[in-house]
Amino acid sequence: MDEPSLDIEGFEPQEPSSSSPGRVLRDWILVVVVALSAALFVRVYVLQQFYISGPSMETTLFENNRVLVNKLSYRLHAVHRGDVVVFDRITTSGGVIAHDDLIKRVIGVEGDVVEVKGCKVLVNSKIINEPYLDKDMLALPSLTDRCRVVDMQPITVPKDQLFVMGDNRPESFDSRSFGTIPEKLVIGRAFAIVWPFSKIGTL
């Protein structure tokens, strides 16, 4: 049986055409636009890095720490007690609206009754376990030095609201001062420290 043959008469290999400078530039512009769009999408809807300013969350977080915040968390499930959250606190002064991103720990959710007795935080009449509080702070002889607000009357957390507090109770401006916050103002859940490298870890 004859083997099939390939007629290559008149066949001339072609040199690959080199891309024109204009085409290369267009390709690079497309790559940059796609990369920037993806980065913007992630920052707006998925993950964002936040910089810690102030001592209100010590000793969990310190000034100049950087944390990653998951913006998808609360689209998938409810806010839980103990979560560390970043939220937008809106204030008005002289007709000017100001936005300030704060980071605190969730103490009470919708329907919870939160109170403070002798610096002990109670939720639904039970003292909550708070292993994240600084032991040196808890050992201070003065209750005021330990927590600033020694006693607080019971507060029932309204629908779609949260009661939040900083871990550094003497230095934190939180729901003990400005009341509960709307859950819709929560930006996301802080879940990891990414700076400094020596402190990298989950929250």
Which ranges hold each PLM region?
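Soluble "head" domains of membrane/secretory-pathway proteins
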Residues: 2-25, 30, 41, 45-51, ...
